[in-house]
Structure formats: structure tokens, C-alpha cells
Amino acid sequence: MTNNTINYAKLNRVRLRDGMRENASTTFREFFASIHGKVSGLKGYTILENSDDNNETLVLTFWGSKADMDNYYSNGNSSLSSLVEEVKPMFEKMPERITYNVVSLDVTK
């Protein structure tokens, strides 16, 4: 495993209240900009807005190690807890989180 290897992804499936998608996506982008380079093992993220369902957004985070990912998503992460509290009023329900092993990832620059 090299320093740039992405081995894990965390899917956060977010169900939003009507009209909240733009605000939520902006908040997520600002949050990731604020933690850029400060989170051990975080290799990147992507925000996906469902083109057929305005109330669904997916946030994927990419990780080198499961330990770093698990630490980030632990209850003790105050920055993540603060983000959740900020966007909670926008949620239709709390996000579903699923961990995936990354088998293959190819992004052409």
C-alpha cells in the first residue's frame, strides 16, 4: 500500500428536505475545503447529486486505511459532529453510511 493508494470508500447517502440540495452541497464543499490536508488518510471526496431525485445526494470519501476512515467517522470527531449538526435541519432523515473496499479506481486527468 503506497501513500496515494485508495483502499476504502465511505458512502454517505443523504436524503434531504425539499429545496435543500443546493444549500447542503455548498455546506459540504465548504466543509471539505476547510479540512483539506488536515485529516489523516483522507485521499479525497466527491459529491454526487441524483439527477432524477432532487432530495438525494451522495457524498463519497476516499481513504488509504480503514483505521483512518473509522477514526474520522467515530463519535469523537468534533468537526464531523459539527457539520452534521449544521446540516441536520436539511435532512429528511439521517444519512445512511456504508463502507466499501475499493477494488479499482481510474480517474483520467
Language-model features: locations:
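Short acidic/polar alpha-helix capping motifs at helix-coil junctions
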Residues: 8-12, 21-22, 33
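Glycine-rich beta-strand-turn "strand-cap" elements at beta-sheet edges
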Residues: 1-6, 46-55, 83-109
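An amphipathic, aromatic/His-enriched active-site/gating alpha helix that lines ligand/cofactor pockets
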Residues: 30, 34-42, 62-98
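Short, surface-exposed ligand-recognition loops at beta-strand->loop->(often short) alpha-helix junctions
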Residues: 15-28
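Short, flexible segments with low predicted structural confidence
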Residues: 7-8, 24, 40-41
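Short, well-ordered beta-strand segments in beta-rich or mixed alpha/beta enzyme
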Residues: 8-15, 45-75
